A protein has these predicted regions:
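Short, well-structured N-terminal submotif of metal-dependent ribonuclease cores
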Residues: 1-24, 30-46, 51
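Alpha-helix capping/helix-boundary segments
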Residues: 8, 24, 60, 85, ...
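Short secondary-structure boundary/capping segments
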Residues: 9-12, 45, 68, 88, ...
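Short, hinge-like loop/turn segments at secondary-structure boundaries
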Residues: 35-39, 71-72, 114-116
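Active-site neighborhoods of divalent-metal-dependent phosphate/nucleic-acid chemistry enzymes
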Residues: 52-99
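Short acidic-hydrophobic, aromatic-tinged amphipathic segments that line or gate anion-handling sites
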Residues: 54-55, 113-115
């Protein structure tokens, strides 16, 4: 699984079943920095120490191109970072766990699990 968004770590599967995309890690860091609270950064560091962070590779770029072109052709775009996250997960055959399942479900061939 690739994790996106805030979750209770204790409720998630332990590694190696769960991992975080480097794209998600970047989004989480942006949120932690904007929060301007040391506790946010410390919590994020713990999360990133617990779960493996998966590198975004050139292999993922082809899948991204396929996803973006398909979504645009169907007139069902999703956010640009969500497209990258979807490409990363689909290239690995992974499941995206997200609070934004509705948007990710627009991506053909992507496994999505709603996180509440």
């Amino acid at each position: 699984m690739i994790l996106r968004g805030r979750t209770a770590v204790a409720e998630l599967p332990a590694p190696p079943e769960a991992a975080i995309s480097a794209i998600v890690a970047a989004e989480l860091w942006a949120g932690a920095v904007k929060a301007k609270r040391a506790s946010e950064a410390a919590a994020l560091e713990q999360l990133l120490d617990f779960f493996p962070v998966l590198d975004f590779t050139v292999n993922v770029t082809r899948v991204y191109g396929e996803i973006r072109a398909d979504l645009e052709q169907r007139g069902q775009p999703i956010g640009p970072l969500d497209q990258l996250i979807a490409a990363h997960a689909r290239s690995l055959g992974a499941t995206v766990v997200t609070v934004n399942a509705r948007e990710f479900k627009r991506v053909k061939g992507l496994k999505v699990q709603a996180w509440k």
